[in-house]
């Protein structure tokens, strides 16, 4: 995550980065799992790697305020974005240093942990510590939703050797669309996914592709983990 700070600061500050609408797999998570299967549509939600807050606002709005969002990110300029957004309570959103503890930022327990496309930038040790902090922050019965990049992801890019911290350098976008490097922790399979999120109990798991154009940039397959305390 520290390796990604400069890259994402550049994207947000200079390139207008940030979703304007919620991801399709997030909408399906709410409609199919939270609303239909679990009937769990109220409580406090921690959005880890919340960016401009688009998913936090989605959960708040779709539930008529039943879900109260809190957020964490590492890009300093996002603080001003949250403060200007009338749909967000800026006091509930925090900037943290990469790979740092966050458990003392909140004086409340969470009913949902939401980590969409953010946890795989953490080193192996920081990831392990984050999962434990999530668990300690959660009320009994809380739901965690998280996504991780599968080993198929970015296979057409240049992927460096596995480093001691569990990350690989990813660079050389085959289409030339992206510059620079990212440092990513890849997940081999569903069994590794389930193991990584212990002590949460797995409820549902699967995968999705953002887009897979075989002759352009290839697969960006992600795994989905939905678990419970």
Residue spans for each PLM region:
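A conserved beta-strand element that flanks and buttresses the S-adenosyl-L-methionine
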Residues: 114
């Amino acid at each position: 995550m520290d390796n990604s700070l400069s890259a994402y600061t550049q994207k947000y500050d200079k390139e207008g980065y940030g979703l304007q609408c919620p991801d399709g797999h997030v909408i399906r998570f709410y409609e199919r799992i939270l609303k239909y299967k679990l009937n769990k549509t109220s409580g406090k939600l921690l959005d880890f790697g919340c960016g401009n807050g688009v998913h936090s606002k989605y959960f708040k709005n779709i539930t008529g305020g039943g879900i109260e969002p809190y957020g964490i990110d590492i890009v300093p300029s996002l603080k001003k974005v949250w403060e200007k957004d009338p749909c967000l309570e800026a006091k509930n959103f925090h900037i943290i240093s990469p790979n740092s503890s966050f458990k003392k930022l909140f004086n409340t327990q969470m009913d949902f942990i939401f980590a969409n496309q953010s946890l795989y930038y953490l080193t192996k040790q920081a990831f392990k510590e984050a999962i434990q902090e999530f668990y300690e922050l959660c009320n009994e019965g809380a739901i965690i939703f998280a996504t991780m990049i599968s080993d198929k992801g970015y296979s057409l890019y240049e992927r460096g050797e596995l480093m001691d911290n569990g990350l690989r350098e990813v660079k050389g976008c085959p289409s030339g669309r992206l510059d620079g490097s990212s440092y990513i922790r890849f997940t081999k399979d569903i069994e590794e996914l389930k193991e990584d999120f212990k002590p949460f109990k797995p409820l549902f798991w699967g995968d999705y592709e953002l887009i897979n154009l075989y002759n352009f940039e290839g697969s960006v397959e992600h795994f989905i983990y939905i678990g419970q305390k």
